[in-house]
Amino acid sequence: MNPINSLAFDLHSVKLADANSDTAALSNSNTPTMNNAALLQRPSSIMDSIGVQRVPSPFVPGSNAISGASTVPFNAYDAEITGSPLQISANQENNSAFSAASSNLHMNASSPSVLNKPSSTFPNVAPYLYNATGPAPNVGNQPPPPGIESQWKYIDSNGNIQGPFGTNNMSQWYQGGYFTPTLQICRLATSPEPFGVNDRFIRLGELTTLVNNYQDPFVAFDFIVIRALNAVPLVAPTSSEKQKVESRDLIPVADVHSDDFTYEEILGLKFEDGSYYHETQVWVPVDGRHITKVDRIPKISAYTAPLSTTSSRSNKTTSSHEEKVPSHEEASPEEQEVFSEEGRTVSNITNEEESIVKNPTKQEEESRGSEKEQNILDQVQPEIEEVDRKDVISTADEPKSKDTPQMTSEEQKRFAKAELMAQKLLEEQQRQEEEKKRREEQRKLKKEKKLKQKQKKEEEKLKKKKKEEGKLEKEKQKELLNNILTGDTETPSSENTATSITTNLAPWANKKPEGAVYNQISSALEDLKKENSSKKEKKPNRTQLDREQALKLQKEILSSAQIPKTQTGSAWGIKPQQPIKVDIKGELMKDSTKINSQSKINKANNGDIKPDSTFIEEQKKLWEQVQKKTKKFNRASSLDDFISRTPSPSSSALNSSNTSNAWTTVSSKSTTHIASTMPVAGNQSKSYISLDTLRSSGGLSTATKTKMSDKSKQIGSSTSIPTLKARQVKPSRIPAYPGNASVSKRQEFLRWCRSQLKLNTGVQPDNVLEMLLSLPPGSESKEIIADTIYSYSSTMDGRRFATDFIKKRLECEEEINDPLSWSEVLAMPEGSSEDWEFQVVGKKKGKRF
């Protein structure tokens, strides 16, 4: 027997295992089998232990059951999709399809399984499409199948469409865990596919159920598409709900993606919001005549219909119109043309009505009123009539159609709309008028509030002004009282100007006060006198003992006043041409009887001048007022210094009677008596004496001032400069002549003063020194000295000079022991030689000490 024929016979009689066979050799076989194949009844062969062949055998004839089972017709996919049972012919003569499919299957043996359902579900489908044990190994590591790679899009969490991306990228992201089953994905229509998911968003979970692959659905989808395009039998397991999917003809299309669509594609597009394109027909006139129809707008009188009636009427018309007018889609092309024209006219009408509604708001802003609206409507009316006339002509030319009742219903609808718009227009006008009134009322209220606020502000300003004026008046009154207190001592001398002789004032002190100031002072003095006379009970600040002492001091001063022998006039302005020589020694060595007789003569001479009791009482009252004011304003020292320099009528009379005598007699008795009885003023104020006060009282020397007395002598004159006299004279003994040493110390002090004084041009140092030496030597006169220096010098340091001046003056006055005053010392000559010393008669003539 030929061995080749025996081998062919063995291969032909191989027992083929069906799908339910338990043979181990065929359990993992991928060779397609058929359940309806006839099983051969023969004993087992050696081929049963080897296994089934895995490559097509060239010895198998075309009429074999294997080839018939392996060959699937091209329309198997379509038959399965439509739900019809798959009919596979047993004798199929197309071996090329089987060879191509088997070779393709063996090339992609490691690719993932398409479906995971068991083959028992689909008994008529080849079992190589299913894998009961799960997906094939290494399914995620294989590249996508060659030939076709799908393009996918997806919607991200923000609602944005991302993509398109290839199958490889989508597979990697899916395996990386970036995609969830609820992700919306869409496959672009690059090629036909059997599931009908092109250009449609589905969830990723739906795709996995379609391809029955949960590990890599994208690659599995591409495998299924390739099988379908290569005419490989492929059955997609579909559920009972999706078995009636419309089948599509599988037409090979080039893998070219473009955003340009054809007309048919545009009509088939559907967007996410459900919109789509559809065909419409629009009538375009050929003759070029453009006719627009405008509905007739009724007059204003027709607009007064209530809103309820118009709304009900419009509802009726719209309901009737809906019943009569067919839908736009069901209408014929001619009717669609009519509808398009009506749509244009309605849009024109609504635009015009909107413009009419908008006009009143602009007119309201421009505040032109409702009259202009009426004018606008009157202007629009002829245009509407012309349009209606043209419309009638055009309708007469056109043939009558069946849609005349529809046109009438449209007109009714337009009239209803016009009435509604008119009603809205009126309501808008009323609302705007109400807003106008409300705004005007608000403006009036705001204006009233502003006026009230302005009035309040003005009232507050007036109150403030009144308060300020009251304060200023009070300050002026205080200043007047202060001026009165400082100027009380000036009135007696001004009243007795007729009897006194005018003195020659210094050039810097020769300032005439204005008459208005004197008038104010005199009027204020009169008011004070009236008030003092009207007051019956007063509260004295001092005890009765102080009053008695003050009266005693005044009497003693009046009794101890002597006749001055100095020349009349002030020594401030002119320096004496001839030196004054005083025989101090002879005067000191006089007998006490002579001094007593001299005092008696003075008393006899002054006997005629007696103090008046009424004047003394007035002085007491004024003294009490002055003490009150000094405690409040702290002006005691300034008043004392001022009063001490005021001349009295008696002293002026004595000066007039002794103008020719140029010698001065120094009385030791009077000086000692004053020093013993006069109290020391301990509380001297530091207030500043004005220059006007100093100028008005700077006409007489201090020696003359201390000896003047009269009925009109001012208050406190007995206590002027008490410390100077107390320090100069010791009451315990009669002073003896100190010699030239005491006088030389005075001259040294004056020389130092002259060297330090750097005054302005025209100011004599002696005049300034005389004024400064008339002040008390204590620290209370420091500021007065400093102010005086500042007023007469632009280069000196007034405060420093004041401290040095007071210090040196106190040192000088502690060492000197003579009855001379500083004014007398200033009147002495000065020079480089010692001729300024006092000439005393001695043993040898011409000898100078």
From Swiss-Prot:
Q: Name one GO biological process term.
A: nuclear pore localization
InterPro entries to which the protein is assigned, alphabetical = GRB10-interact_GYF, GYF, GYF-like_dom_sf
Q: Which residues are in coiled coils?
A: 410-484
Determine if Phosphoprotein is one of this entry's keywords: yes
Give every GYF domain span: 149-205
Positions with biased composition (Basic and acidic residues): 319-331, 361-375, 387-403, 425-443, 456-479
Region ranges (Disordered)? 305-505, 527-547, 593-612, 634-661
Write the record's keywords in alphabetical order, separated by commas: Coiled coil, Cytoplasm, Phosphoprotein
Query: Where do Low complexity bias regions lie?
Result: 308-318, 644-661
Q: Which SUPFAM superfamilies match?
A: GYF domain (SSF55277)
Asked if the keyword Cytoplasm belongs to this entry, the reply reads yes
Gene Ontology CC: one annotated term: cytosol
Quote the biased-composition stretches of kind Polar residues, using this chain's numbering.
483-505, 594-605
Q: What does the subunit comment say? A: Interacts with ribosomes. Interacts with EAP1 and MSL5 (via the GYP domain).
Member of which family? Belongs to the SMY2/mpd2 family.
Q: What is this protein called?
A: SMY2 homolog 2
Q: Which organism is it from?
A: Saccharomyces cerevisiae (strain ATCC 204508 / S288c)
Q: Which gene name belongs to this protein?
A: SYH1
